[in-house]
Amino acid sequence: MRGPGHPLLLGLLLVLGAAGRGRGGAEPREPADGQALLRLVVELVQELRKHHSAEHKGLQLLGRDCALGRAEAAGLGPSPEQRVEIVPRDLRMKDKFLKHLTGPLYFSPKCSKHFHRLYHNTRDCTIPAYYKRCARLLTRLAVSPVCMEDKQ
């Protein structure tokens, strides 16, 4: 991506070159002026390179983020170390969120197998976007006839 900086640099070099030739034979040129002019041009080129490399790095990082998104979608996902850090906090938040939505729920020993299957193995209770569905399913399970038998 060489956008507007490349023509600007070319134009600057043309202007500097034309200004140097314009003096011609009227004034004798000293080598120090030529060195100063060359040093100035080199500094300008370095500034432009820094500016373009910063833009290029930003674009590379953006591209890398998109590539990671595709990799995660393909099932590669983040490294196992990152998963270990995320899961415990997520489980606590899941529990708090579901208790907030459902209130205190009681499941009889007969019903605990159904509860564990629902809570740990369904999409609704494992993906945070579906926690409201999970809360609805858990409350329906708690008041179902199978789970209400031991309460009476």
Curated annotation (Swiss-Prot):
Q: Where in the cell is it found?
A: Secreted; Cell membrane
Q: Which InterPro entries match?
A: ALKL1/2 (IPR029364)
- Signal sequence: where? 1-24
Q: A Gene Ontology MF term for this entry?
A: receptor signaling protein tyrosine kinase activator activity
Mind listing the UniProt keywords for this protein, alphabetically? Cell membrane, Cytokine, Disulfide bond, Membrane, Secreted, Signal
Q: Assembly state and interactors?
A: Homodimer; interchain disulfide bond is not required for homodimerization.
Family, according to the entry, reads as follows: Belongs to the ALKAL family.
According to its UniProt entry, the function of this protein is described as: Cytokine that acts as a physiological ligand for receptor tyrosine kinases LTK and ALK, leading to their activation. Cytokine-binding is sufficient to activate LTK. In contrast, ALKAL2-driven activation of ALK is coupled with heparin-binding to ALK. Stimulation of ALK signaling is involved in neural development and regulation of energy expenditure.
UniProt protein name: ALK and LTK ligand 2
The organism is Homo sapiens (Human)
Q: What is the lineage of its organism?
A: Eukaryota, Metazoa, Chordata, Craniata, Vertebrata
User: Which gene codes for it?
Assistant: ALKAL2
